[in-house]
Structures are given as C-alpha cells and as structure tokens.
Amino acid sequence: MSTAEITANKAAFERFHEAANTGDAEVISKTIDELVAPDAVIRTPLPIGATGAEALKQVWAMLLRIYPDINLTVEDLIAEGDKVVGRTTVTGTHQGEFMGVAPTGKSVTYNEIFIFRFAHGRVVETWGVVDVYAQMRQIGVIPA
C-alpha cells in the first residue's frame, strides 16, 4: 500500500469521527455511505440485527439517543498497510435509555479502540473494543 493510500485512510478515519462530532444523524449516515462498504464486516458485538454499513448507521442513531451531546477525541491514530487503529476518548451526557437504564443526566467519559481495514478507499472490516464497564459505572449501575 502506498504512502498516499495510508494517508488517505487515516484522513477517512478522522473524517468519520468529525462527522460523528456533528451530532447530526443525517451527516453521520451520509459519511458512512461514503466511507464504508455496504457489506463491511463489523467484528464488534452489536446490540442490533443489521450488518455492514447499515449496522453502523443504526449504532450511531442509538448513540445519539443515549448521548445526544456525544463527542469523540482521537487520542492516537496509527496506520500500517491497509489498517488504521484509533484510540478515542468519548464523552457525553446520559440522556437516553442505555442497556435498560433510564436516563440519569450524568456525564460519561469512556475509551474505545477501533481498527478499520480499508480496500479501494473504503472501510471493509472493523474491530472495536468499547469500555462499556466505565459507562455502566459512571451512570451508577455498577458501584464505583
């Protein structure tokens, strides 16, 4: 993979996060359509039945309901070959039901790490680790 392709893949990762930070479901959905292959393989367990790009759209719709003011800060971004790895800090206010927990109004900060694999300029596979424990602790489900 060329240096230009690696640079473009990193830019796509950042663009995805910039779209997420708009808090606008339509902007996020359009960005997913542009950056993610419709049949992308999502290797992160998701609480929905959809697959591919549609799964990501549904996850983001859910996240915007839970944390309408969600904000992602990319702390580290590493690219090699066809993969981009990002470590992100996520903040938001718990304003929608989350895993059966009614809104608490509490501020939440958690970390996640995602790997995006690219082919022909689009995301074709993802892996992710999201710190759900931190979210549950901060909204009071798990004792601190």
Per-region residue spans from a language model:
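C-terminal and inter-domain tail/linker signature
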Residues: 1-144
